[in-house]
Amino acid sequence: MTTREYDYIICGAGSAGNVLATRLTEDPDVTVLLLEAGGPDYRFDFRTQMPAALAYPLQGRRYNWAYETDPEPHMDNRRMECGRGKGLGGSSLINGMCYIRGNALDYDNWSTHKGLENWTYLDCLPYFKKAETRDVGPNDYHGGSGPVSVTTSKPGVNPLFEAMVDAGVQAGYPRTDDLNGYQQEGFGPMDRTVTPKGRRASTARGYLDQAKVRPNLEIVTHALADRILFDGKRASGVTYLRGSERATAHARREVLVCSGAIASPQLLQRSGVGPGAWLKELDIPVVLDLPGVGQNLQDHLEMYIQYECKEPVSLYPALKWWNQPKIGLEWMLNGTGLGASNHFEAGGFIRTRDDDPWPNIQYHFLPVAINYNGSNAIEMHGFQAHVGSMRSPSRGRVKLRSRDPNDHPSILFNYMAEALDWREFRDAIRATREIMRQPALDRYRGRELNPGADCKSDKELDAFVRARAETAFHPSCSCKMGYDDMAVVDEEGRVHGLDGLRVVDASIMPIITTGNLNAPTIMIAEKIADKIRGRQPLARVDVPYFVANGAPARNVAKAVRQPETV
């Protein structure tokens, strides 16, 4: 057994862990050990580096933990996919590369919780900007010198993107030029974490590339954290496995858990921090009975509303193996072409009811009919909208199955457990159909493939959701930040009741944000990094942002085609 000592030990080299490793080692006298259970982010592997290949990492286990849920009771008892990234970059190595920060009111809502007053949108915005380099340059809402490369949608891409945005506007919803700027609500182009050379902009590329040469950072891959060690109530180190070899590292200052919304509560529970009754079931000595560890689990659920495309402009030919060598060669040599995009270049956020204070539904538009993980491709030209609700009231949990770090935990999201979930998904399907029947899509829109034009009643729509809805791969909130009885960490990520231990990743969100989670997770890590370093927080950015204040969710009077009656 080997033993080493560092100032900080970080468990997990993902969207948050790489940020902390980079920022903490900017201080040359601070030593950091970064542990990652997966391997390197091999830059020659097109599966993780080519944006268009985003489905491939989800189809294996080299880069994907490939978790599976317990039977979901409201989803026909299906065991559902829960992919999480494994390797330097974590889930930023296998995600869909959509750069969505969330709605300003997400953070303003967090700040209404006791003790979280410094998590308003205007407090968070400087850290979003700090992390970002946007290809069209900085402005009041965007950064120009950060580690994360953000690419905007360019004119001349697939005509279906513009048509779908125009259709949303024709249906009476707003147009927005920037889903991460003044107004998230509406339809418009989508920013993506892609480099100017057409490569995936993971946190391994953006952050670790600048930090890994520092002598005060040690990165150990294929290192599976087993347990956090404690000296009384103070975290003192970590034991981890590399193959059959066990090693121990000691932390002079802090242990930072950045393993994500599934593995962070799993590691805490295995270390004796969690609901006491759960730990005793597995004969784990209780360091601290902390009931919220693994509770409050949230995710985004989504459906694919698919249509036949009457004109041959979809990405369907690119799915054929005989066309892929040319696409790959152009990407490899020039960083251009179909391989250089994730093809989520347009989307939007809407409110389905006037009394929704901010958007409750997200759209990703895709010019092909296929599942996110690359399965169930429709054998024809087609297009689809990925549609899902943003802030489900349903809550799940992550619970340890055994003390073996190689065993996956029991995961139950408890999808669709509340009446509001069903109302929002029915609303989403019907709103999508109204968008798709607008004139902008007339030349492209063929028959509805899924759910199918005959699927109309509440009962039929509900059956479709139960059978076909899938995860958007956004698990979060399982070690929530706050000060109520179920909170796990305080406003700086420090675990309640313990010293020298923080959790910093998407698991500490008190409520899931409106949109994809990579950008908010990076922001959280940037913000807490300043706290760890004892630095003054960045000054608030005093910019305006859109608030609906009860305005109609949709201007039906301006809709080009009025709603159909059901």
Curated annotation (Swiss-Prot):
Keywords: FAD, Flavoprotein, NAD, Oxidoreductase. InterPro entries: BetA, FAD/NAD-bd_sf, GMC_OxRdtase, GMC_OxRdtase_N, GMC_OxRtase_C. It catalyses: choline + A = betaine aldehyde + AH2; betaine aldehyde + NAD(+) + H2O = glycine betaine + NADH + 2 H(+). FAD binds at residues 7-36. GO terms for molecular function: betaine-aldehyde dehydrogenase (NAD+) activity; choline dehydrogenase activity; flavin adenine dinucleotide binding. Residues 180-202 are annotated as: Disordered. Gene3D superfamilies: FAD/NAD(P)-binding domain, Glucose Oxidase, domain 3. One of its GO terms (cellular component) is membrane. One of its GO terms (biological process) is glycine betaine biosynthetic process from choline. Its cofactor is FAD. The keyword Oxidoreductase applies. Pfam families: GMC_oxred_C, GMC_oxred_N. The active site is at H474 (proton acceptor). Its EC number is 1.1.99.1, 1.2.1.8. Pathway: Amine and polyamine biosynthesis; betaine biosynthesis via choline pathway; betaine aldehyde from choline (cytochrome c reductase route): step 1/1. Involved in the biosynthesis of the osmoprotectant glycine betaine. Catalyzes the oxidation of choline to betaine aldehyde and betaine aldehyde to glycine betaine at the same rate. Belongs to the GMC oxidoreductase family. PANTHER family: CHOLINE DEHYDROGENASE, MITOCHONDRIAL, GLUCOSE-METHANOL-CHOLINE GMC OXIDOREDUCTASE. This is Oxygen-dependent choline dehydrogenase. It comes from Burkholderia orbicola (strain MC0-3).
